[in-house]
Amino acid sequence: MWLRLAALAALAVVPCAMAQDVPPQTVLTLDDAIARVAAQHPDLRLADGQQAVLTAEAQRDALRPPLRVGAEIENVFGSGPTRALDQAELTVTLASVLERGGKLDARRTLAQARIDALAPQRAIARLDVLADVARRYLTITAARQRHTIALETLAQRQRTVSAARQRLQAGASPESVLLTAQALQARAELDRDRAQLEVATARRQLALLWGARSIEADQISGDALQLPAIPEFEVLAQLLDSTPELARLNNEQRLRDARLQLARSQASPDLDWQVGVRRLEGNNATALVGNVSLALGSAGRAQPDIRAAQAELSLLDIERQSQALQLYATLADAHGRYRAGQLEVARMREEVLPALARADTAAERAYRAGATSYLDWAQLQAQRSDARQQQLAAAVEAQSALIEIQRLTGQPFVVTAETTP
């Protein structure tokens, strides 16, 4: 697949002296770019920080209610018999809350569901970031190939200027033809310079993804005209069942189940208890004390939260159906755009461009021999340049669709051979 383009092969036959004088050029592949972004992009590191937060919250939610120690003294520093400490009553207590209804287990389940929900979120973020890397890498490759087309067009215009000058010197053509050819050559030079600037801008945009100002590599591997074979739409549609977007909804169901369980546990009131020892100084005696309390109406107060949790859970099926339809429609659109671009690129490579190349050669011979006009040759050159631009545009559209297909399915489609017409 486009996302897995192989690196450019090094030249095998090079004189030894030249190999010593010229340092080898470094090549940045798409896999290299992905590795750099995966190690440094903040969106991918964000999930690790979120997991640390949720783990700490899970440890907090797993704690039982604390024990409370208290002391109370009565009948001291008053008047009459309580003027001193003779009638003092000192009570030391130990108190806590007995949770009922499975609140502790419900909190633990909810905390774990939140942690588990990070996995599909991390997978979605990774696919989104890698798709962004692939798109920016594709932008570089497309700009580089537009620069190549501009160089070829410029070479054509230079040949035209040379031929027009020869015919002018021979008195077989007016000066206006030469001036027109020179103007078209200047426009071709402008297209070349603009394409070169686009390459530099695209390289900087890619480097920003891993926090760099520019790409140190000399070359960027890959060919936008490489379009691999992909399965039929029905086969790709089956892969959507395991996509991270739907996996996220499965984890969301467990999360909402846990919220419902926690809401139901609130219907059982907690039992507040307290036990202690009381010292009766006036009677020189000791006694045990204790009390329990239970909140009333907990079941009624818990009903709104229970109904809200049930409503959220029932909405999940609708959300899953909506998400599946959206993924299905996006995949269908991307698959159709890829097939159309693949067909156009192949037809241009096999039929249109070879025919225009032969026609260009024949028109050049005819013009130099005086058998055709400059206008016919110039129009043919423009058609050939436009055809190459059209082929590249179709290839870029197909590659963009292919990146979207991989983002949806998470499956690579590898190009087995490079074919650059």
Regions found by a protein language model. Name each.
Residues 1-7:
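Bacterial N-terminal signal peptides that target proteins for export
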Residues 14-16:
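N-terminal signal peptide c-region/cleavage motif recognized by signal peptidases
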Residues 20-151, 157-161, 172-178, 186, ...:
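Short flexible linkers and secondary-structure junctions
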Residues 21-24, 28, 193-237, 270-272, ...:
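Short, solvent-exposed, mixed-charge loop/turn linkers that connect secondary-structure elements
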Residues 35-100, 121, 210-212, 237-319, ...:
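A small-residue-enriched
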Residues 44-61, 125, 129-150, 159-161, ...:
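Amphipathic alpha-helical coiled-coil segments
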Residues 85-86, 179, 190-193, 197, ...:
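Outer-membrane beta-barrel domain signature
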Residues 125-242, 334-341, 345, 384:
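Periplasmic alpha-helical coiled-coil/stalk elements that build and connect Gram-negative outer-membrane
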